[in-house]
Amino acid sequence: HLRWYEDRLRHLQGLAEDVAEEVEFFVFSDHGMSDVHGAIDLIPEVERDFGPNGKRYLAFYDSTMARFWSDDASLLDELRDALGQRHEGRCIHEDEKADLGIAFDDRTQGDLHFVVNEGLLIVPSYMGRSMLAGMHGYHPDAVDADACLLGNFSPSLDPTHIRHIYDLMDATAGRLVEERA
């Protein structure tokens, strides 16, 4: 698959070079991919211990993360304790959410977040019923979570977060416009 992308990117770069004196070309990803080697069947275990989804709590089961909402703080504590006993993942603590950029002022993203370890999936989940060979969306500290930035030039900015890609594109485009004016 990489050869297919390389061929098309080189073709695109060639088209740009046909119409411009200077082309600064870069490609970026927003995350890496991890090989999947196992799955956990989390939904029936949570429902066995805490009742059906939608009664005392609301849960959304993504392939790598489970999010929980409840107005019952003691239930959230019980969920956190139960999930904290699992070796296949961990709960994201409140103080860590700011570092990850997920400390939202509202509850739209959940009250409690459980993320599975790299290489595992929650199967079934609301994202699918079967295990896949690769996945993203693990904790940013995961070995294969890093994104990449490839280009034919040295960037003026060193992006360390996906939010910085826009700043890099804006600075590069602005500099090229100024140089050509």
Q: For each predicted feature, which ranges?
A:
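Active-site neighborhoods of enzymes that stabilize oxyanions during catalysis
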Residues: 55-177
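Basic/polar N-terminal segments that are highly enriched at the extreme N-terminus
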Residues: 179-181
